[in-house]
Structure formats: structure tokens, C-alpha cells
Amino acid sequence: MKRFTFSVPQNILFGEGVLKELPGVAGKLGGKHGFIISGPTLNRLGVVGQCEEILTQAGIAVSTFCDTEGNPSVETVERAAEAVRASGADFIVALGGGSPMDVAKAVGVVAKYGGSITEYEGADKVPGAIIPLITIPTTAGTGSEVTAFSVITDHKRNYKLTVFSYELIPAYALLDPTLLTSAPASVAAACGVDALIHAEEAYVSLDASPFSEAMSEKAMELIGRSIRTYVADRSNREAASDMLAGSLFAGMAFSWARLGNIHAMSHPVSAFYNVPHGVANGILFPYVVKYNEEAAFEKYRKIYNNISTEKKSAEEFSKGMLEQAVRELNKQLGIPAKLSDVGVTREHFSQMTEDAMKSGNIAVNPRKTGSEDILGIYEEAL
């Protein structure tokens, strides 16, 4: 067994109704003034107000920023950080999907240490602890509530920059399945596929360890058995719980094992064409599965048996089956089949390939990958 390191420096509360624990959690952080970062949809639906009321009834002051967008930008981080500084808040609550959480992590850095988030791009450039952060996911997808990453779009470069630091890991994550009922089917599908891909890429990663593999396997089991049910009926509490737990385990898995070519390639797609992250990942999923098959085949049957409606023995399983199962799942969930379906053209392929190759995920992809391979996958997926 190869050497590995694994630690989880975080507190996680999971279950129906744990949102009500928010004041107590804030109190453990010494919080007197919370700053909620969320999006306009959750604000309109009253979810932000619900969270705000829970805090104010406990005597905790609250300020809000409800202007995060999909693929959040450097400018959004700057505006939110200025609002945090002006408010005097001493802890941040990230409420929503991956976008508010990415913004909140970045804001926790910039509001405390100054400068632009671009100055912290890369690994281990955050000088110390950020403003204490509590994450409350309302989608089952990114796993950002437990990860050490923040991904922010730099429109000046048409580039999605990544900040990696263990300082970004939130102090607390509150996972309440009752909050997942407001997601539209299309969002539930894209987020669910994203979570599944987190588990799959971490599972076949060259950095996978027994701990990360165990989490990946459990994530794939939970997501595989419930994603179709949840997308069809977001009010199904059992399916929502499976999806939320699966997303959590997948997030923990890739925090330590990292990801692969799918994420390396999807970030440029989103940066150049503003395609939702989960949709971009989902489109690329079968093409990268096909590319990696020779190197990762030994693990493919377990992935297949978790996501397919059929089970195969070792004797029955053969090449191409996982790719086909992914295509069938995407079709069932309404994920587009081609990049051209979401407006992507060859115009930016050269720069997109260059940007994908900058990703640290390329190095841990199970099959060695060069720029010509990335370009070839983009071409095939078009």
C-alpha cells in the first residue's frame, strides 16, 4: 500500500432541521455579526430571509450580499469583500451552491488580508486563517462546503483561477436535506452529475488513497441510486439526503485525491462560454471516460455498477460499457450530448487547451495527457 496523508479539519452537521443549529454554531466561533453570501434566487425564494431570521432571533446581527452569479467573477469577490469590511461582520455564512461558497471563501481571504483574489491564485498563498466560514449547501453537487478550493472567473483573461489552501476549509458545514427542494430539475441534474464526476475522478486519480477511494465508492453508491429519483422529484427527502451525503463524500474525496481531465477541460468551457460548471462537466464526462479507459479499466466496473441500472460481473463487463452508461444517464437527466449544443465553437480551442493544461488535475489523471490529447477530446466532444 502506498503512503498517504488524510485529515479532516472541519465540523460537519448533517440531517433534516440542522439549519436551526446555526446560532449555536456561530456562538462556538464567537460570532456576533454574521454576513450571509448567497444568490438572487435564494433571496427571492425566502431562503436567505429564513437564515437571517434564525440568526437575528438569537440576537446575532446579520448583513447580506445576495448578488453571486454562476461562474462568479473577480469583481463579485471584490464587491462582496468591501461589503464585509464595511459591515464589521466577524463570521461569514455561505448559503447556496458552489458559487456562493467559492465567493465566500475568496471573500474570507480578501476581506482579511487585502488585495485582489488574483494575488492568491495557486497553492498555499493564503497567509493564515480566513474570516470564520459556515457553509450551508442548497444543492447537491459541488461539495464545496468541505473543500480547500475556491474557483473564480477572471474575465480579463477568460480564465477560471483556482485558489487552494487548507485555510479555505470552512469551520462548519451544515447539511440540511430540506433545503434541496427549491432547485429546478435542470440545476439538480447538473449539480448531481458534477458530484458524481467528483467521485469518479477522485476514484481513478493517481493520488487516490484507501480513504479517498472509500469515500468515492460511498458517494457513487448514494448518487447512483438516487440521482434519477431526485431530479424527477426534488421533494423526495430520502433521495435528497442521499444526494447531499453523496456530494459531501465526493467533496471530501477530491479534496485529497484531486480530480482529472474533465475538470481541467470544463473550466475553460465555462470561462469562455459561461456554460454552467455541472453542464460543462457532464458533456465532457463520456469523452474523458473513453480516453481514460485503458489506464483505469480495473476500476471502471465498480463505477458502472453504481451508476447503471444494470449490474455486471467481472466476466460480463467489457470496454465501452461505462462510456455508454454515462451517455444513457446524461440523456435521462437532460444533459446535452455535445459542446456545440451549448454554443461552443472551435474559435477558442487553442487557448482553451492551453488553459486546461495549466490545471493541476492533469498531473493526476490516470492516463498521461498532453495538449494534443486535450485538443482531440475537445474536437470529439464538439
Where is each model-derived feature located?
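N-terminal amphipathic/basic leader segments beginning at the initiator methionine
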Residues: 1-29
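Glycine-rich phosphate/diphosphate-binding loops that line cofactor/substrate pockets in enzymes
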Residues: 20-35, 54-58, 86
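N-terminal small/polar loop signature for handling phosphorylated ligands or for N-terminal nucleophile
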Residues: 43-115, 229-240
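Glycine/threonine-rich beta-strand-loop-alpha-helix active-site module
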Residues: 75-178
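Glycine-rich phosphate/pyrophosphate-binding beta-alpha loops
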Residues: 141, 248-281, 359-363
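Carboxylate- and glycine-rich phosphate/diphosphate-binding segment that chelates Mg2+/Mn2+
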Residues: 149-257
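Gly/Pro-rich interdomain helix-loop hinge
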Residues: 272-348
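Short, amphipathic C-terminal "tail helix"
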Residues: 345-382
